[in-house]
Amino acid sequence: MSDRDDEEIKIADDFRRQLQERFPAYEGDRTKDDVLDWVKGNPKLEEFISTLGENARKELLDEMQVELEATPLPNPRDEPFTHRIVQELCNTIESACRRAGVPLRGGVAYGVSPTFALNAEQHHVPTTGTSVVELSAGFISFCSHLSKALSWSIPHESAGNSLKLDRQPAQVLKRIGGDSELKRLWLELFGAYAYGEGPLSVEMRIVPHPYSLTRMLLLRAFELFAVAHEYAHHVAEHGAMESLGVGGDPEASSKEIEADMFAISLCRYIEQEGKQPNIFLVSGAAPVVLLKCLDYVRRTRKIFAGRDSSEETSSTHPETEERVLAFDSYVDGIPPGLAVNFQRTRHDFCAVIDSVWTKLRPLYLLMYEDGLRVEDSPVAWLPGSLG
């Protein structure tokens, strides 16, 4: 890295600090000592590790504490748990870009925005070739909650030394419909996050084995795609032109699709180096599920704000639907048979998400009729940004 690049990264780090300072204090503000105490005294974490299978080592909790203690925190409002998540994701993306010969320009300052809003963002840093890439604390929590709800909803069946997952929408919906805990999970996923206090009001749940293994794959897929999407904006210099002008960007929609396609391509490049590629990621199923669920949080919030449209009974938001359909036309050199299978997987998962929200929508309308208002939430925000 040249002296110029090093100086630009320092400017980007300071710019990220200024972005963090825009947010008021919230219940997610924690010091490193607070987080370490939480890890040491949390039996739920030991229970979680036990769900990862016979090969899961009890030492993982001790290793987590050591890693958290060693995690550098560039800015005053960084906290080690979420910052380390984003740090590892960004390191993975940057390493893949270097191997693939994708220029990272002046570099990226990354971290977590201290808010329960659902945001994944890239900010161009003026006068430099750098960007700030951030996931919000709320977004990280939402991905975790979504991975639990979806993994637990998919029927799992042992097949020798492996697991068979039944992703057929009818079977997934049957499982959800027959389990009150699963129904509550999905109700909270859209409702609590739309209301604005998802991370505060959603109880910490431990997904049992073997669903926990699927949950980890889904969580990884949601987070890695989101970060890769923001890096795509940085690589393509999206934001640099807008910062010099006024008004909206007429090419915003096409830029989002471009970023989605870059992200899925880079994620496939990363996964092809592993022995067992993450099927939820390489198929594009997890990315489209994430896009749809963010859209449904937006729709649920509209209900709580009294701005619901009775016609919106499925995910027909033009931008979201256009982005979801773009995955069908981007085969990225994948063999035709595999591309068809990937498309079927995406469509099956989309059908599940559409059906779940359609069934929950009347309940959210009833909540509004009973007096629930989004303005009543002390941490209300406009959720659902992945752009």
Over which residues does each language-model region extend?
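A structural signal for well-ordered alpha-helical segments within the folded catalytic domains
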Residues: Q87, A221-F222, H229, I257, ...
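Alpha-helical scaffolds flanking conserved acidic
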Residues: L213-F225, S253, P277-A285
